[in-house]
Amino acid sequence: MTIKNVIDVQSWETTQKKNVSVTHDKVKLNTRYVDKLIAIHECSALEANEIGFIARFLIKATLPHSKPRLNEWSRKNGNLTMHMMAPSAVGLPYGCYARLLLVWISTQAIRNKSKLDKGIITEQEVRKLELGRSQRRFMEALGLRSSGGKNGSIVPLREQMRRLFKTTISIMLAEINEENGYICEDEVGARVADVSHIWWSANYPERNLLSQSWVELSPKFFQLIIDKPVPLDMRVLRLIKRSPMALDIYCWATYRVSYLKRVTIIPWSGLMEQMGSNYADVKDFKRRFNDGLEKVQRAWPGLDATPTEKGLLIKPSAPQVPRRKKHRTEGY
């Protein structure tokens, strides 16, 4: 779908559906939305200073989309297996907010690593990420509006922060030698945060408090997220932030397109194993995936991906965020 298609759809919907109430799950194709699409199309993320990062392992194996019943979670993709565990009194992170938090954490960790390399900060400071004195400003950095009440954003974000910081993640890579039957397994486990200090006001999120809020990542988790991170366009994330599936698809497609050399069909079973959490069957997953893909392609018209009966047909195209050749820790 091109920018012109989006504008045409917007014009048609304005004429035909003036009185239709659009839910949060549907993109409201208004003038402001189209302006954002045009800005993404005309100016790169680098030029707009809107580059963020996500750890590669979080693309290969994703978080739950909705609240899981258990406090353990596993995802498998090829020879990589991710296992997550959280205290029963807290629970596992899930949904949109957890994903946006992980992008923010990955981005800040990469920036701190760059500062360390330049001698701006020390080894003792590199894993400490400052969240700021104002909850509203932190939420704006995530692309969220600060709102209270039963259906507001403040309480669920705080809950996802608590869940994420207390979670332990293990990554296992398995290699099998088919000739002699040898199996080699490499595994690393890490709690996300060693220490956190959150001091915000739920009643007055806009206030600057005396104490700075911060989180200190564990050494092993810090190393996991700075290892070959994938660059993202934060403007795209903000457009699709309400859909966990769309966020997963965008991050995955950005990485996949970066090395795709020929037309490929990815089976639905493989996609479901990687990111199809909490779905009853392949049919349900396909429907949700296609909805998410449509949201992504509105923001990224150059993504040449088409759902078929067998799987997703994806063709080589320009990465949404171009490769950077110089700094390996700041690109693919």
Question: Which functions belong to the PLM regions below?
Answer:
Residues M1-Y332:
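Charged, alpha-helix-forming regions
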